[in-house]
């Protein structure tokens, strides 16, 4: 997936639109909601697809906090407690860093995709992501929260011999 951060109004996924709308209602005109305001009841239909990542030192690093079952299945394992820097040099995680950093620095909701996954073994998946800031102090992004829509993309058809 190329990192093309778009205005939030370009979301395709109804699930991601629902997560964004819940975030917007909860933010109620503030920079962002606090982490404790993002509850399972608020997101029940999207829980398998949500994730939350703590911002470390203003964006110098990020720590995986929670991920829904669909995210864990896609990623192949749980990453909770690990730092994003542990996976530096891997295309999928480097791309993730760019998206998280943009949200942290711009202090606004962003979306990426839809586009092909760069996760090894998951190249035939198309991803669309909504990335939303959370703030404990109302001024700085302290956690990044979001959801990911994962769709299977069939391999390209084989051309007939001689073409």
Predicted regions and their residues:
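Intrinsically disordered, low-complexity terminal regulatory regions
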Residues: 1-90, 94-163
């Amino acid at each position: 997936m190329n990192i093309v951060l778009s205005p939030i109004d370009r979301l395709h996924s109804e699930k991601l639109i629902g997560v964004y709308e819940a975030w917007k209602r909860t933010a109620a005109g503030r920079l962002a909601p606090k982490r404790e305001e993002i509850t399972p009841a608020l997101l029940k239909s999207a829980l398998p697809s949500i994730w939350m990542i703590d911002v470390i030192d203003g964006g110098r690093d990020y720590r995986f906090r929670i991920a829904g079952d669909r995210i864990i299945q896609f990623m192949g394992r749980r990453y909770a407690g690990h730092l994003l820097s542990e996976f530096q040099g891997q295309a999928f995680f480097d791309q993730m860093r760019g998206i998280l950093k943009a949200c942290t620095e711009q202090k606004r909701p962003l979306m990426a995709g839809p586009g092909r996954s760069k996760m090894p073994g998951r190249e035939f998946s198309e991803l669309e992501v909504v990335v939303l800031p959370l703030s404990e102090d109302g001024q700085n992004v302290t956690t990044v929260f979001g959801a990911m829509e994962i769709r299977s993309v069939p391999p390209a058809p084989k051309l007939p011999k001689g073409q």
